[in-house]
């Protein structure tokens, strides 16, 4: 399971001209689900994402996680993160989970975030989405479990 996380001052996702999720300061999480992923991996990744200390403390040091910083989370499914790009000029998506399994794990990940009392917004699984964000820093990390 893969999360590309970006520290943002704001972010939103729109599907068919409808804003489905919008946050102020916090994390934009682009989430990719791979074939071998399960709930245990989703738990570990959620713990890492929410615990990752990439927000500045009073001394300007990256020392706070999203909850400590009072931030929110916007989770957007992105199957392209599971692409194999090592060869050729066209990515292979054979490493991605089947759509039904990927959706179940995506929804599980979102629910785990919400259980941590963090404002968690979402896109719409498998939809064509427009994501807008203001990357703060920029600060972007690739997390994989």
Swiss-Prot record:
List UniProt keywords, sorted A-Z.
Cytoplasm, Hydrolase, RNA-binding, tRNA-binding
Gene Ontology CC annotations of this record: cytoplasm
Q: Name one GO biological process term.
A: D-amino acid catabolic process
Q: What is its EC number?
A: 3.1.1.96
Cytoplasm keyword on record: yes
Motif placement: Gly-cisPro motif, important for rejection of L-amino acids: 137-138
Please give the Pfam families that the UniProt record associates with this protein: Tyr_Deacylase
Q: What broad class of enzyme is this?
A: hydrolase
Q: Which reaction does it catalyse?
A: glycyl-tRNA(Ala) + H2O = tRNA(Ala) + glycine + H(+); a D-aminoacyl-tRNA + H2O = a tRNA + a D-alpha-amino acid + H(+)
Q: Where in the cell is it found?
A: Cytoplasm
Give the GO molecular function terms. Answer: D-tyrosyl-tRNA(Tyr) deacylase activity; Gly-tRNA(Ala) deacylase activity; Ser(Gly)-tRNA(Ala) hydrolase activity; tRNA binding
Q: What is known of its domains?
A: A Gly-cisPro motif from one monomer fits into the active site of the other monomer to allow specific chiral rejection of L-amino acids.
Q: What does this protein do?
A: An aminoacyl-tRNA editing enzyme that deacylates mischarged D-aminoacyl-tRNAs. Also deacylates mischarged glycyl-tRNA(Ala), protecting cells against glycine mischarging by AlaRS. Acts via tRNA-based rather than protein-based catalysis; rejects L-amino acids rather than detecting D-amino acids in the active site. By recycling D-aminoacyl-tRNA to D-amino acids and free tRNA molecules, this enzyme counteracts the toxicity associated with the formation of D-aminoacyl-tRNA entities in vivo and helps enforce protein L-homochirality.
Q: What is this protein called?
A: D-aminoacyl-tRNA deacylase
What organism is the protein native to?
Salmonella paratyphi B (strain ATCC BAA-1250 / SPB7)
Q: Name the gene for this chain.
A: dtd
């Amino acid at each position: 399971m893969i999360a590309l996380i970006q520290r943002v001052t704001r972010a939103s996702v729109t599907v068919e001209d409808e804003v489905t999720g919008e946050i102020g300061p916090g994390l934009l999480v682009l989430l990719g689900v791979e074939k071998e992923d399960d709930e245990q991996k989703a738990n570990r990744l959620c713990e890492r994402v929410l615990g990752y200390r990439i927000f500045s403390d009073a001394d300007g040091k990256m020392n706070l996680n999203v909850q400590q910083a009072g931030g929110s989370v916007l989770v957007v499914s992105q199957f392209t993160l599971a692409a194999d790009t090592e060869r050729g000029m066209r990515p292979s998506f054979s490493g991605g989970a089947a759509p039904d399994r990927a959706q179940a794990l995506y929804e599980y990940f979102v629910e785990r975030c919400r259980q941590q009392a963090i404002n968690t917004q979402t896109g719409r699984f498998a939809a064509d989405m427009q994501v807008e964000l203001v990357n703060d820093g920029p600060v972007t990390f690739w997390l994989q479990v």
